[in-house]
Amino acid sequence: MQTHSHAITFGADAWSILSDIELSIKNKIEAAGTPLKDWDVDIYRGVLTGYNDAFIISSEKREEILGNCADESEKQRTAAIIRPILRGRDIKRYGYVFAEQYLIATFPAKQYDIDDYPALKDYLLAIGIERLEQTGEEHIINGERVKARKRTNNKWFETQDSISYWDEFSKPKIVWAELSRTGNSFAYSDDGAMVLNTCYILSFNDNEFHEKELNTLLGFLNSKVALFYLDIISSKLDETGWRWLKQFVELIPVPVQLIFKEDGQLTNKDSASINAQLYEQLGLSPDEAEYLDHII
């Protein structure tokens, strides 16, 4: 049997050579699906602090800061901006492990007055304004060279990125790490957890509650079909690592009409069952289904 290969271009930075069977699978996915970028969803990168050693704290440090508050009012204000944070390593397929890490969420977009948070201010001052300021300058302190965060217009106590989309973290959402050694590692979050800049979040761009839709989409994103498509449109980190960057994830065609049928919900978290449903819905041949089961 003669095997053909086809060079496929996906953009300036992504191209792939596909076999006949890979091209057939790709075409069936695209025929049935709508790219995520054309959905009513938003995808955002997680929070870039510019200095995680200061802005990411343990539960013990959080309790210490709250314990140093002068009164209950200050304590409540301060607790409200010390938020649970997920790192890439914390996010697994269909879930995550909260490692008791917290983010000091002083986002520039929120325009906080640090003097309203004396205990938090004291904690940050102890680290040093010279290290936290966003000037890009270098200082010599006690004979040690200290490099400030990169130059921005933000204040010394604020995160490096403005995070104008801060309210998206409070919505029900899908979260994932940019780098993955296990293929697909998407999880559902409805507890208001934030994520670091090595992760992404996806939420619907309205104020409706979309738990069912998000969990169905989650099943698809954790499927062999989604992993296959990412594999052919992006450059892998290495032989066993994938990069789930926004620019690639938003290109994945999601078969909206198929996966949201009442009798076709992909919410049982059973990978084999979800893959089998998708193979049938996409009209994959037995050879194509077997190919996805064994090649990815």
Where are these regions (language model features)?
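A conserved non-catalytic segment of reverse transcriptases
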Residues: 1
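Polybasic, glycine- and aromatic-enriched phosphate-binding surface used to engage nucleic acids
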Residues: 4-261
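Conserved AMP-binding
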Residues: 276-296
